UniProtKB/Swiss-Prot annotation:
Gene Ontology BP, a term: leading strand elongation
Organism of this sequence: Dictyostelium discoideum
Name this protein carries in UniProt: Probable replication factor C subunit 4
Keyword Nucleus: yes
InterPro entries documented for this protein: AAA+_ATPase (IPR003593), ATPase_AAA_core (IPR003959), DNA_pol3_clamp-load_cplx_C (IPR008921), DNA_Rep/Repair_Clamp_Loader (IPR050238), P-loop_NTPase (IPR027417), Rep_factorC_C (IPR013748), RFC_lid (IPR047854)
CDD domains: AAA, HLD_clamp_RFC
Gene of this entry: rfc4
Top-level taxon of the source organism: Eukaryota
PANTHER family registered for this protein in UniProt: REPLICATION FACTOR C / DNA POLYMERASE III GAMMA-TAU SUBUNIT, REPLICATION FACTOR C SUBUNIT 4
Amino acid sequence: MSKIQKKDTEPWVAKYRPKTVDDVSYQEDVISALKKSLNTGNLPHLLFYGPPGTGKTSTILAIAMDIYGPELMKQRVLELNASDERGIEVVRTKIKNFAGYAVNKTTTGTSNPGATFKLIILDEADSMTTDAQAALRRTIETTSKTTRFCLLCNYISRIIDPLASRCAKFRFKPLDTVATIERLKFISQQEGIKCEESVYQAIQVVSNGDMRKAITYLQSAFRFFANKISEDVIYNIAGSLPPQLIKQLVDCCKKNSFDRLQSMVQSIIAQGYPVSQVISQLFDYVLTTKDLNQSQKSHITMKIGNVDRNLIDGSEEFLQLFDLSSYIMKQLNNNSTSTNGDDMLIG
């Protein structure tokens, strides 16, 4: 493959990943604290947690680049995806072997020429088994003179306390609308993409604070549609329902007709939209609408939980979506708030 072809097919997530700590944006508190550690040359074990696509991996790779430079990165950084290599054997062999040997001080060309430690990055560490985490805790204790560990996870509650307590914890918050759109516009400018403001808004909505998703959606849309990107294109790529379709479903519920509602639900199913996604967007509607009072919202939310559980258990999708839609219709057209969320539960 030629260099031009490689450049054209390179994922933009990798292409526009921050190369240094100064390039990392939107996580100012985290970066400020980490810079102080880098300046003192005393990097602790780290635990980064937060939603996907908020910059956890990009930040630690940028830190590693600042410490070691591009050449030593290959020798002194071990990056593992703990969801694939999650068992105790990986800790006992690969991690322990890499962490065990000492290294010389880093030389010129790095921001921290006195660093005498290696770095092990464990992505998706919350997928590791409890036994593997316990073994890792012991490895961290015995190799702290030669190795620093950085654990990345979405759910800090899944990391055992003895392991979490040995790390400096940093929370990565979801990116807000302004930050996401600003970054998308920068990438669009670099790639020569022309989009309406509404397209960026649509990407922000479907990515829900996940910058990795947002950039991937933008690249996919540009690949297939060039500069003819519309809101509908973004919703199709993301597998989300266009807002107007959710509105049509809600309007159908307001008309209080089971026949019309059944036809509407059948139409949505026939168009191939994931029912889990439909339910998620209905949940967003319930939270934000002014057509329902707080009691009605709480009843519908309980119903959504029941339907979601039934879908996970393998219940028929049409029946579950029709059941939920019927319940929303009942609440929208009923002033009584005494309805129980299990009235129409279909297993």
